Amino acid sequence: MFDFASYHRAATLADAINLLADNPQAKLLAGGTDVLIQLHHHNDRYRHIVDIHNLAELRGITLAEDGSLRIGSATTFTQLIEDPITQRLLPALCAAASSIAGPQIRNVATYGGNICNGATSADSATPTLIYDAKLEIHSPRSVRFVPINGFHTGPGKVSLEHDEILVAFHFPPQPKEHVGSAHFKYAMRDAMDISTIGCAAHCRLEERQFQRITPGIWCCRANADSLPTCRTDCTKCAIKPANAGSYQRICPARCRPAFFMAGQ
């Protein structure tokens, strides 16, 4: 049995925000894949729960007429993987989502929970970074939009106040031609393991040069990082085999790995 001190199921987003504001000790429950573990271990910091699982405001994948994309924070990883819009526009995010745990977890774990948990092994962080996403965050005071770059402030730490809720991810219109993106995950085991290293990259080509390249790396760093100096160094570089060694050296030189490994 879970030892709840209080449990509230929010009916609306406004209701959830008010419940958080009224109870400084409350924790949000969406997919629950991390929260339920804490409850199972009788973590005293998780005795007051606000359930936001069924809030319509946190659901849906919507493509606007201008090409911008909104993904609700309670979207599950299975929904991300299977949606034709994300498959077409955000392939690196779909690849990262596919690498997370097993099907049972992906069916319930949410995109927003993976980002807000602040774990250094969060597989969705680097693809969110390379696509220049902004986070829509609601509180009793305001609605703010913040870039994903800088949202993570340290292991298990994010720039989110107690009474704030991540409602959605907003992606700018993605170029339709001469672009590519990819995600890579290294784990100690292939099957359902957390990341030791997670990286992704998004690039746009023009006349056989990198017109724009955005790398992202995490797990071996305390925070998700877009490596801005690496972005500068690689932009305008000619794409040819002779430069491959230079590309391979640039990112590790800028990475400054964290002092720990994820999962240890």
Annotate the PLM regions.
Residues M1-Q264:
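C-terminal structural segment of proteins
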